[in-house]
Amino acid sequence: MGKIIALANQKGRVGKTTTTINLAASLATLEKKVLVIDADPQANASSGLGVNIKEVECSIYECLINKADIREAIYTTDIDGLDIVSSHIDLVGAEIEMLNLEDREKIMKRVLGPMKNEYDYILIDCSPSLGLITINALTAADSVIIPVQCEYFALEGISKLLNTIKIIKSKLNPSLEIEGFLLTMFDSRLRLANQIYDEVKRHFQELVFKTIIQRNVKLSEAPSHGIPVILYDADSTGAKNHLALAQEIITRNNK
């Protein structure tokens, strides 16, 4: 049985999509079968994995709103074992369309259910909001990774996200756990980055991943080429960081 992991933080530009793309690619490189669900209308995870959004005929939108078979929405990528269900700009209005649907918070859970038997990991890239699509993702997920960027206001909004997780856990998804807090955009030369690292570790202790995602030029460049950093430059710090993160997650889940 596979594991569904949502990557969520309502604060934008924290490295959420970058982590989704490169963690997925790293897990697949380590011979895990991985499915990415792009649940962000911006569709950056889709383009970052080489999907031409204009050519997508069936996306996560059709699965959630029109009850399309998710298998019709699965696209392969350049990495063996890594597939993706693309997003679409129509997802912007999906939350309004879902308001009158029965069990509207559990639609994604029903959509993804059959896929747990076909993949080792399903990663959901959430939009930077706590709207109905993100609530669906957290209701469907077994756990959540919370990226925290090592910059000013890093912990801004975290308490609101944690409260949302607590509510979802109590009312919709009792098995939801925090997979871990992931420090991103870390630059050890900066005093601020080290201060934030210390603060996050003090607050969340063993929930913080040992792996830290460092600032890296190759990591920033890879999405514009539509490939994960491990294909763009396998020797880069960004590629090595995400491989280490993938191995840490595999090890945690094998215990």
Spans of features found by a protein language model:
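P-loop NTP-binding core
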Residues: 1-255
